[in-house]
Amino acid sequence: VGFVKHRAEEQPVAVHPIGCVSKERAGETLAEMASMAEEGAVAFSDDGAPVYNAGLMRRALEYSTMLDVPIINHMEEPTLNPDGHMHEGAVATRLGIPGIPACSEDAMIARDIELARITGGHVHVAHIATARGAELVRRAKSDGIRATAEVCTHHLALTDEAVEASGLSAHTKMHPPLRSAT
């Protein structure tokens, strides 16, 4: 974190480093969050992969309350979609491609909102892609739970139909996947 902050001083843009939740992003042992926060980390995430271990996520959220920083989680429950490559739905079925169900995202969001509720921590949903997930965050916020989210423009502008229309281009493969319009 210190290295990134030092290099950022030479740049014309503001850089706000995000530290790892777990050591080496392995999802097993909590990283030295307090040390990274002292160095300037503004949040913590293992993005690219979810913090799958609920106990680890709970501890991270507990620490986040002391450090007053959010925990950003990539919301996919991996055991629900081990072989999926796109949204589970009519397009995936038509193309014969294993799908990733929307519930894999929604289940992880619900879990982390509950953990934020009991710890008082701030959970941030990275690149939300389901209407149900957005509703879960909206409801959590109205209940006073520290939950926020962001969405990528491609999840707003495209649906899983783009996978087929692109001729299965790798440009349409992402996590979470492009979802259906419904």
Protein language model features and the residues they cover:
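Metal-associated gating/positioning segment near the N- to mid-region
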Residues: 1-10, 19
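Histidine/acidic residue-rich metal-binding segments in metalloenzymes
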Residues: 28-182
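Active-site beta->alpha loop and helix N-cap motifs at the rims of alpha/beta catalytic domains
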Residues: 20-26
